[in-house]
């Protein structure tokens, strides 16, 4: 099992942001994590990636408890935050190579090709558009071919051709056995690629279903 969330609760003072959240995600699954603003998506992702400790409950990445052994769990985890931080004085090739050096594995040219950055790989990141910066962050997350890949609103700022390119990249790593979790408001995207949809509402799971149920879910977004 790639990801297991067990009875997750997260409170911030009196605010109960996540309530009794439980699910498991197998290798090769592509999960679309959706929900209105304030549903608990970002809090959930931060607990999955070990950035936030749950008030109660636990997260396991590839069998590793993220509360007690976060570094071991992160060794099998690729992550793209909603607002990625990059070293803009580097080129994309240098940035991705830096990640490979840290992780101790990875194929820079494969990641550049997969995300469509090859022609611009040696330009400085500070010269990039927001969309190209986001693709660089995605390339950094998948270069080491992690067993789990988690992306928080990673399609924001991408034009339609770039969205299609990124989706193909994510589908390729999923087909190789990576468990992918994509938080997004772009529901049409999920119909093309997701194997499951998890919809949060008020910090709890409202739906855990197949993409074919997206029509009904879309109505709940208003």
Give residue spans per PLM region.
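Helix-to-loop junction immediately C-terminal to a conserved catalytic motif
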Residues: 49
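Hydrophobic anchor residue at the start of the ABC signature
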Residues: 138
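Catalytic Walker B motif of ABC-type/P-loop ATPase nucleotide-binding domains
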Residues: 149-153
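Conserved ABC ATPase "signature" region
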Residues: 97, 104-120
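Conserved ABC transporter NBD signature motif
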Residues: 57-68, 72-73
